[in-house]
Amino acid sequence: MKKTLISALILTALFTVTGCEDKEAKATIEQQTQTIAQLTAENTQLKTEKEKAEKVIPAIIAQDDVIFDKEETIKYPKSTKEDEYVPTEGKLHYSISTLKTNIEWLDKLLLAQISKNADGKPRSREQLIEDYQKAYDEAKKEMLESPIMGIDETLDLAFSHQRGKLAVFLINYYSYSGGAHGVGGYHYLNVDLETKKLLSFDDVFKPNQQAKLKELLWERYTRYGEIKDEEAFTSKDAFEVTDNFYLDHDGIHFVYNVYEIASYAEGPQELVIEWWNASALLKPEFLQKQYYPVSSNTAE
């Protein structure tokens, strides 16, 4: 009897201990489940906030970011030949600069565009500095051997304007090597801040509308017939549709640099096709972006 009672007490104790352990384990599991649920909710909220932040279109605030800028005045010795003209000095200047927008991907994109070399491949900042220093040293050597008025190679980026998700930049370039004057120009960059990509000519225009596009540009070039074809700087056959363009409130601006369709004295030329006039030439995908309204000639 005593032995049976002891066995019963042991079993009761075991069940009691096991029951307590089950309750504690259950409580622990419930607490862990709540913690996991809370962390999951917080993670989802952070992900949502991040996605919203990424969709926010930043306002561009651009500052010059000089990569290389060096200049000096080189004094030339007087020529020993009376009939030979040698300038007393020549100015040497090499510079390249990009922009700092505090938007990392945009800064990288702009640097890649301004750093492209002859084969179209972008160079690193370090490579640019090395290349410009080498070119500077070679130019200085040439000037000392054959005195000229100067050499100037300038390349920089400028911020033009922004409308929502569209930002427009331009690359300015100027080159002078001792002639009567230097030659400069502009190349525009249209950047979609939402897709983080450059807008190319093919992104904007339908491929089967080239002839119509050329006709519209030619009309504006000749001022709707005011300038006769034979009087134009460029003949109609030689006239080309440039892929150097930018988007603005009044339409699409096609930019022709000096000597392309006008003389040096006349400078760069811009031909504008109004949005309402260009709508039939534009790709549906481009129109869906709604960078600017295209259905009215009073687009803002």
Model-inferred region functions:
Residues 16-19:
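C-terminal motif of bacterial Sec signal peptides marking the signal peptidase cleavage site
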Residues 6-11:
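Sec-dependent N-terminal signal peptides
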Residues 1-4:
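Positively charged n-region of N-terminal signal peptides that target proteins for export
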Residues 21-300:
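Compositionally biased intrinsically disordered regions enriched in Thr/Gly
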